[in-house]
Regions:
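A general structural motif
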Residues: 24, 52, 86, 172-175, ...
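Active-site-proximal segments of metal-dependent phosphoesterases and phosphodiesterases across multiple
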Residues: 144-146, 150, 168-210
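Extended active-site neighborhood of metal-dependent phosphoesterases/phosphodiesterases
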Residues: 1-14, 69-166, 198-204, 220-246
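Solvent-exposed loop/turn segments at secondary-structure junctions
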Residues: 33-36, 61-64, 95-99, 134-137, ...
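Conserved, compact domain cores that house catalytic/ligand-binding motifs in diverse enzymes
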Residues: 23-101
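Soluble non-cytosolic domains of exported or imported proteins
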Residues: 34-38, 66, 148-155, 193
Length: 258
C-alpha cells in the first residue's frame, strides 16, 4: 500500500557561473541602504534579476554591524528573497561596515579568493576592481577609541592596486570598471582625501572606463577631466543602477523611488 500526502516542493535553485570570454555583461548596483530592507524590497520589485550576471552591493548596506541577526535583518534576508538564491552578489565594503562589534565577521559572509575586502574579478573579458574605502574620518577620531588604522590599511591596499592594474588579466581586459564606495570627487573629509592621493595617480594611468560610487546619498555624475581621467557615476540611497555592457558601449540606467 502506498501512502502519500501533499508535501512542499519546488524546483532546485540554479545559477550561472561567470563566463570565461565575451565582452557583454549586465549588473545591478545598490548602495547606502543602511538597514532599510523594506525600502530595498520596494525599490527592486520591478527588476528581473535573472537577466543580470550579478548584483553589486557597493557599501553601507548597514549602519554598523553588531551581530549576525542584524546583518540578515538589514539586507541579507531581503536579498535572498529578491535575487540572491540564484543571482550572485559582489560585495564592496563601505565606511559604515567598518563599525560595530561584529564588523570583523563581515568577510565570513562575503568571502573573496584573496582573503581581503578588496579584489579584482572578471566577467568574460571585463575586469572589475572592488576597492575598499575604509573609514571616512581620521584614525584619531574619538569614535574609534584608538582602534582604527585605516591610513596604513589604505597604503597596503594601494600597493596591491599597483600590482593589480599591472597584471596581464587587467591590461588585456576589454573594459575596466571600478567600484569604490567613497567617490573621488574632491571632498574635504580625511578618507576621501587619502583615497584620492593614493589611488587616483594609479587609476588615472590604468585605462579605467568608468567608476561607480555612493556615500553621498544623492545622484552625481562627474565626466572625465584633467584631474580624474575617467567618468564617475555616484548612486543615491533611494535608487539603483542598471548597467549593460556590450562591446565598446556602456549603457547606464538609474531608477529611483522618487
Amino acid at each position: 500500500r502506498t501512502v502519500a500526502s501533499n508535501v512542499y516542493k519546488r524546483a532546485p535553485f540554479r545559477f550561472r557561473t561567470f563566463p570565461a570570454t565575451g565582452t557583454d555583461c549586465s549588473f545591478v548596483i545598490l548602495n547606502d541602504i543602511h538597514g532599510r530592507a523594506d525600502d530595498m524590497t520596494e525599490l527592486c520589485r520591478e527588476i528581473n534579476f535573472g537577466k543580470h550576471d550579478f548584483v553589486m552591493l557597493n557599501g553601507d548596506m548597514s549602519n554598523s554591524i553588531e551581530n549576525e541577526e542584524q546583518l540578515f535583518r538589514d539586507f541579507i534576508d531581503a536579498s535572498v528573497n529578491l535575487y540572491a538564491s540564484e543571482t550572485p552578489i559582489l560585495y564592496n565594503r563601505g565606511n559604515h561596515e567598518t563599525r560595530g562589534v561584529f564588523a570583523d565577521r563581515l568577510h565570513d559572509y562575503f568571502p573573496t579568493r584573496s582573503g581581503r575586502h578588496y579584489q579584482l574579478c572578471k566577467v568574460g573579458s571585463v575586469c572589475f576592481l572592488l576597492l575598499d574605502c575604509g573609514e571616512d574620518k581620521p584614525d584619531t577620531d574619538i569614535e574609534y577609541g584608538g582602534l582604527a588604522d585605516y591610513d596604513a590599511y589604505r597604503r597596503e591596499e594601494c600597493e596591491w592596486l599597483r600590482r593589480a592594474v599591472a597584471s596581464e588579466t587587467f591590461r588585456n581586459a576589454s573594459a575596466r570598471v571600478v567600484f569604490l564606495h567613497i567617490p573621488l570627487d574632491g571632498g574635504t573629509w580625511h578618507g576621501s582625501n587619502h583615497l584620492r592621493n593614493l589611488f587616483l595617480p594609479i587609476l588615472n594611468e590604468a585605462g579605467i572606463n568608468i567608476m561607480f560610487s555612493g556615500h553621498t546619498h544623492r545622484y552625481g555624475f562627474h565626466p572625465a577631466n584633467d584631474e580624474v581621467r575617467f567618468p564617475v557615476v555616484v548612486n543615491g540611497n533611494q535608487s539603483y543602477i542598471r548597467c549593460d555592457m556590450t562591446g565598446d558601449r556602456i549603457a547606464i540606467r538609474i531608477v529611483g523611488l522618487r
